[in-house]
Design a protein with these regions (language model features):
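A short beta-turn/strand-edge loop motif at beta-sheet boundaries
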Residues: 15-16, 43-49, 136-141
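Acidic/polar low-complexity flexible segments
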Residues: 1, 56-83, 123-125, 134-205
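Extracellular/luminal beta-rich ligand-recognition
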Residues: 1-13, 46-124
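Beta-strand-rich interaction surfaces with strong enrichment in secreted/lumenal proteins
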Residues: 23-27, 114-120, 185
């Protein structure tokens, strides 16, 4: 049912574990649900120690709310876990408590279970699809949305996509850090001595 939906390709072999090497992602939104597709190089839920797929969702497209990761403020988190059998063991949606620090991972709290499936008619699949009720993540079509996807194993290996928006534009980690720095430094331009606190040091040479 994802046929005809435009997806985004991710780099192959950027993780040493093919089970968590994300190679393709997709998103589609209708009036009721937001659905995600995640494909990996090899079947993801086949390791005995378990595999976790997480999606950080900036539901209001505002970096100043939610958990901060360069490029987004994650208001919601999806966590899908599976092991050995090739099937999903658990799939949970979390919200973020904005009274907590923006770098506090424990600020996420559980909201509800969600639908997720990693199997196909032919057996174990290299893809999972999941679906979230729009009401649960408070989507406003006028605000847009950004997200990123991670896949990790218990050995510490991880693959992370770029930040992606609904127009399928991608924002790399380095670009997002640079943009954030420019915004911050714009408030620290030197008025008297000509020194700008911007991380560039050429103005000290004059």
């Amino acid at each position: 049912d994802w046929a005809g939906t435009e997806t985004i390709l991710d780099g192959i072999d950027d993780s040493i574990n093919g089970n968590i090497d994300i190679i393709e992602t997709g998103i589609t939104i209708d009036n009721v649900h937001t659905s995600f597709l995640v494909k990996t190089k090899e079947p993801m839920f086949t390791a005995s120690e378990g595999t976790t797929v997480r999606i950080l969702i900036d539901s209001d497209n505002n970096q100043n709310t939610g958990y901060y990761y360069p490029g987004i403020g994650a208001d919601h988190l999806v966590e899908v876990y599976g092991e050995e059998t090739g099937t999903v063991s658990s799939a949970m949606l979390y919200g973020f408590d904005n009274s907590r620090g923006k770098d506090d991972w424990n600020g996420f709290f559980s909201l509800t279970n969600i639908k997720a499936n990693s199997t196909s008619a032919k057996g174990i699949s290299t893809a999972i699809e999941l679906q979230i009720a729009n009401f649960d993540i408070g989507i406003d079509a006028g605000d847009g949305l950004k997200y990123l996807i991670t896949a990790s194993d218990l050995s510490g290996n991880m693959d992370i996509t770029n930040v992606i928006d609904l127009s399928r534009n991608e924002y790399t980690y380095d670009e997002s850090v640079s943009d954030r720095r420019e915004i911050t430094n714009s408030f620290r331009k030197g008025q008297l001595d000509g020194i700008d606190i911007d991380g560039e040091f050429t103005d000290w040479n004059s």
